[in-house]
């Protein structure tokens, strides 16, 4: 820190120079991110609520009301009229909260002290963080030939210490939806906590269904589902950080509650103490501003771009790994390693990522990627081919 103050002009000049090194979503060349540029109206509202603290809701009753309304609105999308939950920093925190709820609930009501969680091999790395933080043993269920969790593998791995089963609605690498209906039945029959990580698909699948896309049930319409992660800062167009965790029952929050004697509420269940209300307010605003019609149009456009890109790849001669269920396309060159292809694309200014299972170039078709961007990308891929 400098001894003497520096002018705003000089500080902003320095920050602008530093920020120029960042990649911008608006360039359309960030291809591997599940996040995108927030809607301008959501950004405006976010700034309006910067000083609100949901960690002390008695002081910010209006903002707490907004959070409750957002959870209720998301709950309606996920087939539950009275959900419980919070707007948090993202899918990682939401998944950690879900695993903490599962562990604490099993410890209180089943006496399980050394818990195990069954997750697919395709699960997000946040579950490894959760297991490490809460001393849970991870049991990785195998994937089937379609890269979805193998139901038989889940059955085989259930034990007396199983505190949770996890399924994914929109896998990180391929955007696939696990057989959640079958897993819900298994979890329900065995009285095991069942969590659905719909961080990616939760703000897309409900709207795609409304415009004619077919998806099996994945939400609270299934009696075995105990909690769902959903991220407004992905397809919801809310600013980062805005994640959501919804629970079927209040008791899942209660088993995580700790005393907070010097605040305006007696207990607190979230991991983070001080929580900005800005994310809740921005999510509230953009959900009202876009409405069902706006999100249906957005989801439809993303899938149109997905199909356009997939068909373009196949015309050139690239191998598409799986038929896209959501707006992710994974592909390979028939005669080139994925990492080598990624390097060539990076040299051309495209920011791609490489999936690990299977190894393939992974492109996430988010809102900042236009059809023209995809045409330019396909042209470069043609030259590489």
From Swiss-Prot:
Q: Which InterPro entries match?
A: GrpII_AminoAcid_Decarb, MfnA, PyrdxlP-dep_de-COase, PyrdxlP-dep_Trfase, PyrdxlP-dep_Trfase_major, PyrdxlP-dep_Trfase_small, Pyridoxal-P_BS
Q: In which pathway does it act?
A: Cofactor biosynthesis; methanofuran biosynthesis; Cofactor biosynthesis; coenzyme A biosynthesis
Which SUPFAM superfamilies did the record assign?
PLP-dependent transferases
Q: How would you classify this enzyme at the top EC level?
A: lyase
Positions bearing N6-(pyridoxal phosphate)lysine: 234
Recorded GO molecular functions are: aspartate 1-decarboxylase activity; pyridoxal phosphate binding; tyrosine decarboxylase activity
The record lists the catalysed reaction(s) as: L-tyrosine + H(+) = tyramine + CO2; L-aspartate + H(+) = beta-alanine + CO2
Biological process, per Gene Ontology: carboxylic acid metabolic process; coenzyme A biosynthetic process; methanofuran biosynthetic process
Cofactor names: pyridoxal 5'-phosphate
Q: What is its EC number?
A: 4.1.1.11, 4.1.1.25
Q: Which domain of life is it from?
A: Archaea
UniProt keyword terms in alphabetical order:
Decarboxylase, Lyase, Pyridoxal phosphate
Function text: Catalyzes the decarboxylation of L-tyrosine to produce tyramine for methanofuran biosynthesis. Can also catalyze the decarboxylation of L-aspartate to produce beta-alanine for coenzyme A (CoA) biosynthesis.
Per the record, the similarity remark reads: Belongs to the group II decarboxylase family. MfnA subfamily.
Protein name according to UniProt: Probable L-tyrosine/L-aspartate decarboxylase
Q: Which organism is it from?
A: Methanobrevibacter smithii (strain ATCC 35061 / DSM 861 / OCM 144 / PS)
The organism's taxonomy opens as: Archaea, Methanobacteriati, Methanobacteriota, Methanomada group, Methanobacteria
Gene name?
mfnA
